[in-house]
Structures are given as C-alpha cells and as structure tokens.
Amino acid sequence: ELIWFLFIMKFRKLIISLLGTALLTSSVGLSTTTASADTLDDSQNTTEVQPKNLKWAYPFKANKKNGVRPMYNAQTFGITNYMRSTTPPSYFHDGWDFGFSEVGHSNVYAIHQGTVKKVAYGNGLGWFIWVISPDNYVEVYQEGFNKKKDIYVKTGQKIKLDQKIGKLTGSHLHLGVTQTNKDYINKYGFPCKNWNVNNGTWLNPIEVIKSNLKK
C-alpha cells in the first residue's frame, strides 16, 4: 500500500507540472500574439499615403466661363512692365492679380483643397487666407478682402476644391502659389518672402491650375 501511495503522489506531481507548463505556454503565446497585433496597428497608423493628382480650379466663376484675360501686363506672373521695388530694382510679380473689372465683386472659391493655416492681416497683404494642401502646395489669397467679414473660412478649417471661401471687395485678388519646401515665410511669419525675387520660390498660379484643371 505504501508503494502504491508513493506512486500516486509522484504521478500527481507529474500531472500538476504538465498542466503548469501548458498554461505558461498558452499565456506566452497569447502575449506574443497581442504584441504582434499592437505592432501591426502602430505601423498602419503611422503609414502616410501622399495624395497624387489633386485637381485645381479657378478662383472665380467668370474664369470658368471666359478663362483668364488680364487687362494689364502688370497683373500677370513673372517679369512685368511695372516696377515693384527699387531696392533691389525689380519688375517681378510673385502671383496673379484677378481684377474687379474682370470678375466683379463676386465670390472667391478655393483653387485647391487643403487646410487653412491662417486668416490674418499683414502689411502689403491686407486680409489674407493662407492654405496648406495635402500634396504640399501652398495657396495664398491676398489683397482682395477689405474686411475680415469678407472671408468665410477660419484658421484650422479644412476646405474643399471649389468651396466658397470669401468675397472680393477690393480692387483685385492677388493669388500666390508655392510649395512647403520653398523659402516663402518671412521673419515675421507671413507667407510673402522673396515676393520681389524671381528665384523659383513662387510659381505661376495659372500654369499650376491648368496642369490639372477640374473639368
């Protein structure tokens, strides 16, 4: 009987040991699986897909019907016949001016989707809308709004292509287009650096719009 009792006790210890090992293995396997899932989720959350071929549009309805027909050379982008600065002497225009005589006091529409970085007032800019787009383009709508109430969007707001963002109440709307990798922000934090320097900072807005114009 003693031998039988010792045999049962030894067998009992073996069973307990095997059960403990099985539970430990199961627990470790579960932890490993959970960790792998967390790692996968983190990887998915941090993966950014850069948008491609985002559409462009003109800022005024009249442009969609009649195209862009500036009345003066000084309204166009690039080297013009109008001196804009004397030190250094420069005839360079860093954007495109849409005059009241062409488009009237009409609504201004977003030429590209993006997020409003700032709505503010600046010397030489007037009230302006500064937009950063997901494809790293930058759009600045300036000089066309006499008062803040003429602007219909606010800082941090996401805007869509062709969304109404304001109303032209001044003599013209100056439209500037650049990219986030360009040196376009001046020491005061305004989006107008190199405004009188033809060094590639500013792009021709009309050419950019026509490159992928929404039909």
Predicted regions and their residues:
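Zn2+-dependent peptidoglycan hydrolase active-site motif and core
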Residues: 110-149, 172-179
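Small beta-barrel nucleic-acid-binding modules, principally OB-folds
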Residues: 88-102, 133-135, 179, 189, ...
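Acidic, glycine-rich catalytic/binding loops that coordinate metals and/or anionic ligands
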Residues: 42-56, 157, 177-215
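Sec-dependent N-terminal signal peptides of Gram-positive bacterial secreted proteins and lipoproteins
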Residues: 9-33
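A structural signal for short beta-strand/turn segments enriched in small hydrophobics and glycine
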Residues: 114-116, 153-168
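Short, surface-exposed secondary-structure edge patches
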Residues: 105-108, 148-157
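Surface-exposed, glycine-biased beta-strand/turn segments
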Residues: 38-127, 161, 206, 211-213
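Short, Lys/Arg-enriched N-terminal segments with co-localized hydrophobic residues
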Residues: 1-8
